[in-house]
Swiss-Prot record:
Name of this protein: Alkyl hydroperoxide reductase AhpD
NCBIfam families per record: ahpD, ahpD_dom
UniProtKB keywords: Antioxidant, Disulfide bond, Oxidoreductase, Peroxidase, Redox-active center
Lineage: Bacteria, Pseudomonadati, Pseudomonadota, Alphaproteobacteria, Hyphomicrobiales
E.C. no: 1.11.1.28
Positions of disulphide bridges: 131-134
Keyword Nucleus appears in the UniProt entry: no
Catalytic activity: N(6)-[(R)-dihydrolipoyl]-L-lysyl-[lipoyl-carrier protein] + a hydroperoxide = N(6)-[(R)-lipoyl]-L-lysyl-[lipoyl-carrier protein] + an alcohol + H2O
Record InterPro entries: AhpD, AhpD-like, AhpD_core, CMD-like
Top-level enzyme category: oxidoreductase
Protein origin, superkingdom: Bacteria
One of the Pfam families matching this protein, by short name: CMD
Role description: Antioxidant protein with alkyl hydroperoxidase activity. Required for the reduction of the AhpC active site cysteine residues and for the regeneration of the AhpC enzyme activity.
Chain ranges passing through the membrane: none
Amino acid sequence: MSIDDLKSKIPDFAKDVRLNLSSMASDETLTPQQKYGLFVACGIASRNADVRKALVAEAAAKVDASVIQAAKSAASIMGMNNVYYRFVHLATNKDYRTMPAKLRMNVIGNPGVDKIDFELWSLAVSAINGCGMCIDAHEDVLRKANVTSETIQTAVRFASIIQSVAIALEAADTE
């Protein structure tokens, strides 16, 4: 499945989503590794098979397999961290904030690609998963590495578009 196939599946009630997907696909403001890593990580985080397949296929044609693997790692590790740290952040019992997480997350320190790109993907997945604590942590690392607000905003915009594509396809499935 390709992005064009994905666009063709988006119904007219979600025309804005389809147009945003087209804009995202042609956007060249990020490096190819940043862009296609976002496609993979956010496609997986969307939990929609069609979205995941189309975006992974698009990325596989554009970047090295190590980028695909690292983006898969970002989606996977954020799937764990976003649940845990969202709980820690939202729980009224603040004792959880001082307890060790006891979760392996070595991939964050050694993702196999540029660490800043991995942080950007992790931020975008954290936005999809709604973990404010993780969003703040990843945004802080990115800002300290002099990543611009525009780059960060673009990553989150891509995440929002990818998530909206998944939702539009789910909504179309109800017709």
